[in-house]
A protein has these predicted regions:
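PLP-dependent enzyme catalytic core of the Aspartate aminotransferase-like
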Residues: 2, 6, 12, 19, ...
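Conserved PLP-enzyme active-site core in the AAT-like
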Residues: 1-161, 166
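A common structural junction motif
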Residues: 120, 207-217, 268-276
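Conserved C-terminal alpha-helix-loop-beta "cap" of PLP-dependent enzymes
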Residues: 162-249, 253
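Residues at or immediately preceding the N-termini of alpha-helices
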Residues: 18, 142, 197-200, 258
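Short phosphate-engaging motifs
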Residues: 108, 152, 199, 257, ...
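Hydrophobic side chains in well-ordered alpha-helices
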Residues: 112, 199-203, 261-265
């Protein structure tokens, strides 16, 4: 946002809480854009509060609803003007096409559609078929994503190798109360932080069911390390300011049997711990006794 919009003379300011959004509004402000839950820390914002703030100030409000999906969250009913989705993810659900979607007020959609048509943003017929196929099972898939992610988050929260779990469905999540008010389910995305960040790569290569990959929202479970992938272009200081540390791992929880998923995480975390321990021992200088 900062690097692209500023090239066109559009200023950007950042906020996290409703009070910070109020304070950030100036006479030049035209639009409020939020992501809830956010990537990769799964933070949630008060959508109803921001929707009302936008109406009072005469601002367009936009939310990225990709992580939640329409099954779990309805921002238009909470006062937002435009809802965005990466249709590549949960809406399609099969990891075999690319598209995006904007849903909202008729006048705004007319303008967006006209611009999209002028710039060539139209899906081909086969991609439309793939999207329609995915939408037919969206509600069914999301129920399983929700259930599996809830169970996996609870397991990880109790694991000794894990320092923190970020999932809005957990009572200890900082935005659990907000998420409970505005979400019908807490989604299939979570992230967790290892106590020892040096174990990240050892854990990553030990999975048998889960696939190390950057995408999300498909039938299969995927895991990635944001510091090495989505946020790799940021400096370590910039990542730390966002709460993205080297030991953070993001999971797109699929619809596999939950017992298989939990077993895979249990094995990978233990194998990663053993591998890291062996590496530390082998790196110690040898001693010779006479």
């Amino acid at each position: 946002v900062s690097s692209d919009l500023t090239r066109f003379g559009i200023g950007v300011s950042y906020a996290r809480s409703l009070d910070e959004f109020r304070a950030a509004i100036t006479p030049r402000t035209r639009l409020i854009y939020v992501e809830s839950p956010s990537n990769p820390l799964l933070r949630c914002v008060d959508l109803a509060g921001i929707g009302e703030l936008g109406r009072r100030q005469g601002l367009v409000t936009v939310v990225d609803n990709t992580f939640a999906t329409p099954v779990n969250q309805s921002p238009l009913q909470l006062g937002f003007d435009i809802v965005l989705h990466s249709g590549t993810k949960y809406l399609n659900g099969h990891s075999d096409m690319n598209c995006g979607a904007a849903i909202g007020l008729a006048e705004l959609m007319r303008r967006i559609r006209e611009t999209a048509m002028n710039l060539g943003g139209s899906l081909d017929a086969h991609a439309c078929y793939q999207m329609e196929r995915g939408l037919k099972t969206l509600a069914l898939r999301m129920r399983q994503h929700n259930a599996n992610a809830t169970a996996l988050a609870a397991f990880l929260q109790e694991h000794p190798a894990v320092a923190q779990v970020n999932y809005p469905g957990l009572p200890g999540h900082p935005d659990h109360a907000v998420a409970s008010r505005q979400m019908r389910g807490f989604g299939g995305m979570l992230s967790f932080e290892l106590r020892d960040p040096r174990q990240v790569n050892q854990v990553l290569c030990r999975f048998q069911v889960v696939t190390p990959a950057l995408s999300l929202g498909g039938l299969e479970s995927l895991i990635c390390v944001p510091a090495q992938t989505s946020h790799v272009k940021l400096s370590a200081t910039e990542r730390a300011s966002l709460g993205i540390r080297d030991g953070l791992m993001r999971v797109s929880v699929g619809i596999e049997a939950v017992e298989d998923l939990i077993g895979d995480f249990s094995s990978a975390l233990e194998a990663g711990r053993r591998s890291a321990t062996q590496k530390r021992r082998s790196s110690r200088p040898a001693t010779v006794r006479k």
